[in-house]
Amino acid sequence: MATDFKSLPVIDISRLLLKCDDPDMAEDVGVAEVVQQLDKACRDAGFFYVIGHGISEDVINKVREITREFFKLPYEEKLKIKMTPAAGYRGYQRIGENVTKGIPDIHEAIDCYREIKQGKYGDIGKVMEGPNQWPENPQEFKELMEEYIKLCTDLSRKILRGISLALAGSPYEFEGKMAGDPFWVMRLIGYPGAEFTNGQPENDIGCGAHTDYGLLTLVNQDDDKTALQVRNLGGEWISAIPIPGSFVCNIGDMLKILSNGVYESTLHRVINNSPQYRVCVAFFYETNFDAVVEPLDICKQKYPGGRGGCQVFKRAVYGEHLVSKVQTNFAM
């Protein structure tokens, strides 16, 4: 459960990345400091910034800028990669087609998923099968995004080794059958600028309050517009003020289950009060698509009944969880 945090912690993970493939990483003093910070952030807020992550600021900025270029294209051009159920819920959706808790969100987006070969997961994966839809314009869009996905996948794996150390004393709990073949989701999102009445923004909800589905999210947001908000225990909405070159990270529903409720999948939302268009690229690192997710044995031993002794977490199959969300998220 989140605390009454008033800001999100900033964690320099450079030492963790340096030692993350060392079998003796747990004995390194610098790694231990990072692990302690990750543990506290996941318990207190479920959100944190990472710096020292090794992905260049130039790449981070290019990903947002080419996304912005796509959203500036004529509507008819964007519709060439229109999302449909037949396309595996991959592609472009116009403003209002994404729905959170029954309410249309004020954003447009491209949704991409790790591609699933026909029949790989049987009935559970059938609705998600198919290739991603990449636009022909801007040029180099697909090439840049595929490279960015590789970078984010590797970074997420390394951060989760640190979180695994914090939870279980071993860096490898989120590999193998759990996340050795991780699924991923990427959403490229554009939020229109706010309309103003009597000098005040209208406060349209760019994305309604929700939690994320999987293990870990990396948020690449515009440097000059504050819009992402995280709810603390007291019900206050705390702004995730942009820090250039950083990622905002948060944990998802699957990690909450694995931790037996020790780590929080925290409610968050987006309200773009700026008159300018805002771009955000969110990368979601997930378990294996067919992973059966339940509290880790060591978490059941250390934290029986969940945090505070009152929470019970049943097992979930990640792919079923994702499909149930995806099939109700869009008004098409």
From Swiss-Prot:
Slightly inhibited by canavanine (Can), the 5-oxa-analog of arginine. 2-oxoglutarate-dependent dioxygenase catalyzing homoarginine 6-hydroxylation thus producing 6-hydroxy-L-homoarginine. Guanidine (Gd) is in turn synthesized by the spontaneous conversion of 6-hydroxy-L-homoarginine to (S)-2-amino-6-oxohexanoate (RHEA:79843); guanidine is a nitrogen-rich compound that can serve as a defense or signaling substance. 2-oxoglutarate binds at R278. It catalyses: L-homoarginine + 2-oxoglutarate + O2 = 6-hydroxy-L-homoarginine + succinate + CO2. Its main location: cytoplasm. Residues 182-287 form the Fe2OG dioxygenase domain. It is found in: Cytoplasm, Cytosol. Its cofactor is Fe(2+). Disruption phenotype: Plants missing 2ODDC23.1, 2ODDC23.2 and 2ODDC23.3 produce reduced guanidine content. Fe cation binds at H210, D212, H268. Belongs to the iron/ascorbate-dependent oxidoreductase family. GO terms for cellular component: cytosol. Keywords: Cytoplasm, Dioxygenase, Iron, Metal-binding, Oxidoreductase. Disulfide bonds: none annotated. This is Homoarginine-6-hydroxylase 2-ODD-C23.1. It comes from Arabidopsis thaliana. Optimum pH is 7.2. Inactive below pH 5 and above pH 9. Binds 1 Fe(2+) ion per subunit. It holds the Pfam family DIOX_N.
